[in-house]
Amino acid sequence: EYLLFQENIPDIPNLLNKDRVKSGREAISHFQAEYLVLDDGFQHLRLARNLDIVTIDALNPFGYEHIVPRGMLREPLESLKRADMIMLTHVDQCNQDKITVMINRLRGIVGQIPIVETVHKLMCLESSKGGETMDVTWLQGKKVFAFCAIGNPASFRKSIECLGGELLGFRVFPDHHVYTPSE
């Protein structure tokens, strides 16, 4: 993610540090930042904040009901009461009944804060060799072996299938895996 940000928005400082308070102070002192946007900052309670937006993946909204390492949650679901807004992602890959059940359950936890439904839409395909881009329709009817190292491989797989790619194989690596040349 860090490298993607560096490549796609190079004019915006992107700091990487497990100590979010330290990186926040650095952003303010070195770059005169007025606003800080943090990935995975919700559980860092030492941080002062003005707005907490929590993203929840509609494909696995409640993280197997357990905190890491048994599940995917970083905190108990009740912690969502601290959020100012919930963004429910991947709603395009779920049926409406499932979304309604999710929202009703979330309402029982968070009350009336905004819950925004979002979709992931593939805009283009980019070659790993030279950065050439192609329209997503290029995938239609193509035989594909796909691999990924992301938090939600099921969504990636579903995106390929929805675009008409014929999956010959699908390999999942751990989130943020650094690929070797042989892979």
Task: Specify the residue positions occupied by each region the protein language model found.
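C-terminal accessory "lid"/substrate-recognition subdomains
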Residues: 61-183
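Phosphate/Mg2+-binding loops and adjacent switch elements
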Residues: 1-110, 115
